[in-house]
């Protein structure tokens, strides 16, 4: 045994065992001390409701972790904080960044950055954790309302505004379609009505070669007639010159008369007639001469032959033919309009002798632009209107994308507001220090137990300057901010109501137009034209080739309607109106919940900074004690002002209404000059003749039964005589 003991001593086994015992003993004492501290913490009265609820509901180990000292559980605190911060950052990414219209690579980079910052911040800094939780009540404040207002505007745009614009675009497209339909119907009617005439023209143009052949035949035939008219046969040139000179002698003018075709042809016909008469006389002369010679040749007796052949000498009988010349002058067989007809036919024949050709020219007249559209072709009006509508929708979609980006950026204001509140909470002891907290009540109860001056219950006038965080109603101090926020929300509500009303009204109008604007277009036309040209002459053939082309018949029956052009308005159902108004209703609810959200800010900040909360509550209590001691003097200026307003004579209209309308008496009662409560039968009126200030019973007791209006300043309880400028402010 001695050897074993010496061996163990030489190896230092006993020293190591003793050291292990010391370490275990110290750890056991430390655990016992911490357990005692936890039990003492549990036995100690909590300073906040949150602390009390956590002590009541959580196990001891969790309580030790939550209210740990600096440096305790560093690894656990970092891991839990990093995990929580990373999850919150991912949720924030899904809410703000993921809806953006950006590249996926940029979204991945933003996700990694947000998750890293959230994990590091929550794992290392309580200020980051506090500011992150402050986002919840800040979302109920004006910053959150700004964020929700963007979604409200987006919902209004995507709901009634988008539907309103869609219906207006539908009507614009309907107008363009109607104009295009009318133009097409007019064009179709014009084409149908002019189709026979165009067919005639095309037929004439198509029969150009045959017409040219017929015209050449007519020209050839007319040349023979023209040669006959212009021929000099049947008379001698001497007769022509002699008769022409005699014709010119009839003219009284010195100017050589113009011989028309009619006169020339009559002259030539007359000369031919006279020439025939003269030839007849000459033939008669020759016949008598021939017969006289034959007679003389047959009768050889000289005397007898002269006597017997004497009748053959009666050539004067041939002059009887001169009588016919009178007929040549008086009854010449020439029509009176032959010359004019000949000239017309001659001119026509020479005109037809040219090549027959026809061209159809269409002239297009461009009208001015219509309804603001720079249309260059009526046929494309509907297409241009639809393109214009699509272009406007593209611009609006781009604006909506920009609005979504701006909405995501507005969340930065919420972050800034949360950090700003935390900084003001830690550095400005008066900032948002108007709450009657649990620790405030504990201080007052402890002072009351020690017999010192206490503050609770507060006076009636004092209750309007503080906030009781456990009351479920909106208090006077909070009400002014709630009313202001509701007034700021009123334009959004009015915009929603006006757009919904306009959308419903326009839908009703457009639907009525659609139901009662159906138009049926009917176009019916028929014709049958038949021209018969009889005869086998050249002119008849020519007329059959030309005028005969008019022998056409057609029957047209066109029916169309404006059903494709009628507007098809879209109406919003109850679900659409609810989706459009839900963000606006949420905005109004946020205005009402702002007071409770602002109370939650102080609770979160007090949980992370309990020592700072104790200092703030103690400062607020001491400040309240000072104000209580000088309550009368601090409120004197406001009391005197209200008393002077009550003594002022009312407006004559108000006085007349007061006399004539007994029902208005309850609304026109006077108020307490301290707390502004309505006059009751228990109210006290100052008996001083020139004062007559009204007090409720509780305020009169708080004034120690001294009227600040008519009591000299030196007799009041303090030397202060004006409102304090160092009051705590409400953290807006």
Curated annotation (Swiss-Prot):
Residues 1-46, 98-107, 416-489, 598-732 are cytoplasmic. Disruption phenotype: Knockout males are sterile despite normal mating behavior with ejaculation and vaginal plug formation. DCST1 and DCST2 double knockout males, but not females, are completely infertile. Mutants have no disturbances in sperm migration into the oviduct, acrosome reaction and zona penetration. Mutant spermatozoa are capable of binding to the plasma membranes of oocytes but fail to proceed to membrane fusion with oocytes. InterPro entries: CSR-E3_Ligase_Protein, DC_STAMP-like. GO terms for biological process: fusion of sperm to egg plasma membrane involved in single fertilization; innate immune response; negative regulation of type I interferon-mediated signaling pathway; protein ubiquitination; sperm-egg recognition; ubiquitin-dependent protein catabolic process. Pathway: Protein modification; protein ubiquitination. A zinc finger (RING-type) spans 672-711. The chain crosses the membrane at residues 47-67, 77-97, 108-128, 395-415, 490-510, 577-597. Expressed in testis. Keywords: Cell membrane, Cytoplasmic vesicle, Glycoprotein, Immunity, Innate immunity, Membrane, Metal-binding, Transferase, Transmembrane, Transmembrane helix, Ubl conjugation pathway, Zinc, Zinc-finger. It is found in: Cell membrane; Cytoplasmic vesicle, Secretory vesicle, Acrosome membrane. The keyword Coiled coil does not apply. It catalyses: S-ubiquitinyl-[E2 ubiquitin-conjugating enzyme]-L-cysteine + [acceptor protein]-L-lysine = [E2 ubiquitin-conjugating enzyme]-L-cysteine + N(6)-ubiquitinyl-[acceptor protein]-L-lysine. The RING-type zinc finger domain is responsible for E3 ubiquitin ligase activity. This is E3 ubiquitin-protein ligase DCST1. It comes from Mus musculus (Mouse).
């Amino acid at each position: 045994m001695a050897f074993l003991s010496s061996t163990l001593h030489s190896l230092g086994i006993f020293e190591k065992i003793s050291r292990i015992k010391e370490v275990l003993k110290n750890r056991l004492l430390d655990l016992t001390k911490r357990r005692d501290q936890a039990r003492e913490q549990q036995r100690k009265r909590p300073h906040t409701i949150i602390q009390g609820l956590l002590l009541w509901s959580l196990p001891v180990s969790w309580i030790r972790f939550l209210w740990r000292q600096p440096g305790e559980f560093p690894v656990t605190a970092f891991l839990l904080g990093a995990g929580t911060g990373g999850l919150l950052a991912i949720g924030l990414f899904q809410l703000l960044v993921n809806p953006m219209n950006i590249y996926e690579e940029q979204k991945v980079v933003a996700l990694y950055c947000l998750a890293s910052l959230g994990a590091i911040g929550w794992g290392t800094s309580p200020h980051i954790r506090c500011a992150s939780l402050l986002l919840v009540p800040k979302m109920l404040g004006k910053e959150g309302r700004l964020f929700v207002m963007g979604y409200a505007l987006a919902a209004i745009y995507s709901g009634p505004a988008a539907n309103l614009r869609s219906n207006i675009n539908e009507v614009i497209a309907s107008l363009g379609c109607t104009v295009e339909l009318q133009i097409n119907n007019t064009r179709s009617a014009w084409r149908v009505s002019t189709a026979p005439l165009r067919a005639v023209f095309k037929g004439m143009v198509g029969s150009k070669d045959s017409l040219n052949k017929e015209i050449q035949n007519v020209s050839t035939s007319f040349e023979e007639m023209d040669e006959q008219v212009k021929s000099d046969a049947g008379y001698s040139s001497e007769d022509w010159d002699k008769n022409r000179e005699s014709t010119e002698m009839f003219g009284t003018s010195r100017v050589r008369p113009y011989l028309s075709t009619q006169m020339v042809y009559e002259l030539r016909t007359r000369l031919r007639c006279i020439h025939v008469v003269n030839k007849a006389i000459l033939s008669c002369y020759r016949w008598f001469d021939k017969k006289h010679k034959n007679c003389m040749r047959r009768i050889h007796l000289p005397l007898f032959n002269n006597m017997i052949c004497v009748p053959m000498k009666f050539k004067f009988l041939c002059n009887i033919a001169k009588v016919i010349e009178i007929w040549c002058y008086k009854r010449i067989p020439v029509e009176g309009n032959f010359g004019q007809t000949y000239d017309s036919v001659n001119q026509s024949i020479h005109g037809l002798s040219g090549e027959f050709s026809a061209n159809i020219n269409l002239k297009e007249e461009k009208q001015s632009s219509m309804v603001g559209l720079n249309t260059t072709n009526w046929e494309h009006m509907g297409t241009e209107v639809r393109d214009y509508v699509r272009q406007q929708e593209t611009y609006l979609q781009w604006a909506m994308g920009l609005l979504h980006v701006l909405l995501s950026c507005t969340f930065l204001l919420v972050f800034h507001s949360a950090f700003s509140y935390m900084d003001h909470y830690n550095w400005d002891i008066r900032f948002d220090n108007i709450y009657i907290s649990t620790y405030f009540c504990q201080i007052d109860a402890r002072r009351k137990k020690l017999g010192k001056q206490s503050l609770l219950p507060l006076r009636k006038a004092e209750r309007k300057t503080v906030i009781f965080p456990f009351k479920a109603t909106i208090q006077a101090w909070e009400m002014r901010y709630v009313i202001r926020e509701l007034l700021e929300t009123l334009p959004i509500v009015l915009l929603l109501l006006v757009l919904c009303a306009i959308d419903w009204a326009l839908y009703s109008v457009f639907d009525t137009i659609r139901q009662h604007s159906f138009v049926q277009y009917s176009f019916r036309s028929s014709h049958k034209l038949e021209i018969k040209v009889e005869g086998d002459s050249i002119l008849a053939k020519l007329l059959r080739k030309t005028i005969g082309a008019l022998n056409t018949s057609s029957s047209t029956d066109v029916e169309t309607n404006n059903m494709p052009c009628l507007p098809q308005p879209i109406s919003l159902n109850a679900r659409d109106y609810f989706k459009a108004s839900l963000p606006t209703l949420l905005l109004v609810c946020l205005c009402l919940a702002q007071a409770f959200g602002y109370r939650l800010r102080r609770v979160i900040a007090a949980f992370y900074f309990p020592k700072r909360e104790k200092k703030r509550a103690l400062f607020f209590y001491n400040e309240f004690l000072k104000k209580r001691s000088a309550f009368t003097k601090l409120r004197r200026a406001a009391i005197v002002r209200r008393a002077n307003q009550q003594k002022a004579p009312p407006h004559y209209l108000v006085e007349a209404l007061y006399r004539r309308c007994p029902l208005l008496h309850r609304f026109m009662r006077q108020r307490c000059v301290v707390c502004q409560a309505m006059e009751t039968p228990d109210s006290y009126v100052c008996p001083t003749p020139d004062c007559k200030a009204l007090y409720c019973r509780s305020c009169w007791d708080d004034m120690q039964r001294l009227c600040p209006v008519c009591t000299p300043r030196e007799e009041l309880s303090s030397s202060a005589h004006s409102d304090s400028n160092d009051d705590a402010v409400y953290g807006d």
